[in-house]
From Swiss-Prot:
Keywords: Amino-acid biosynthesis, Cytoplasm, Histidine biosynthesis, Hydrolase, Magnesium, Metal-binding, Zinc. NCBIfam families: PRK00051.1. Zn(2+) binds at residues 76, 92, 99. Its cofactor is Mg(2+); Zn(2+). It is found in: Cytoplasm. GO terms for biological process: L-histidine biosynthetic process. The gene is hisI. This is Phosphoribosyl-AMP cyclohydrolase. Its main location: cytoplasm. Binds 1 Mg(2+) ion per subunit. Binds 1 zinc ion per subunit. It comes from Methanosarcina mazei (strain ATCC BAA-159 / DSM 3647 / Goe1 / Go1 / JCM 11833 / OCM 88) (Methanosarcina frisia). Its EC number is 3.5.4.19. Belongs to the PRA-CH family. Gene3D superfamilies: 4.10.80.70, Phosphoribosyl-AMP cyclohydrolase. Pathway: Amino-acid biosynthesis; L-histidine biosynthesis; L-histidine from 5-phospho-alpha-D-ribose 1-diphosphate: step 3/9.
Length: 120
């Protein structure tokens, strides 16, 4: 196993890209610190670092829309990680399956899977 201390963090953080293992759809990206990576490996559930709240958070902690991590890959520069997951519910807090639900023109192209006001 790669030593998480050897990853190239910037200000203690590394980008975590989340992809649905089955469909290959990119679901989201978020920052992770070493603790988030370790907790993700330990529990099998995606954990991230919230820059706004300055704390560790488990994806789906409030909504129940967990990301069950099936595999973690490290990129060639060792400065980002890819989490291949089984997504439970939507990944986006706006109610969409993916955070990448709009194209450059602002057109909604993603699938809405829940109403945020019913969850948060």
């Amino acid at each position: 196993m790669i030593d998480f201390g050897n990853l190239k963090y910037e200000n203690g953080l590394i980008i975590g890209i989340v992809q649905d293992r089955a469909s290959k759809e990119v679901l989201m990206c978020a920052y992770m610190n070493r603790e988030a990576l370790e907790k993700t490996v330990e529990t099998g559930i995606a954990h991230f670092w919230s820059r706004s709240r300055q704390k560790l958070w488990k994806k789906g902690e409030t909504s129940g829309h967990l990301q069950k991590v099936k595999e973690i890959r490290i990129d060639c520069d060792m400065d980002s990680v890819l989490l291949l997951v089984e997504q439970v519910g939507g990944a986006c807090h706006m109610g969409y399956r993916s955070c990448f639900y709009r194209n450059l023109d602002g057109e909604v192209v993603g699938e809405k899977v829940f109403e945020p006001e019913d969850v948060y």
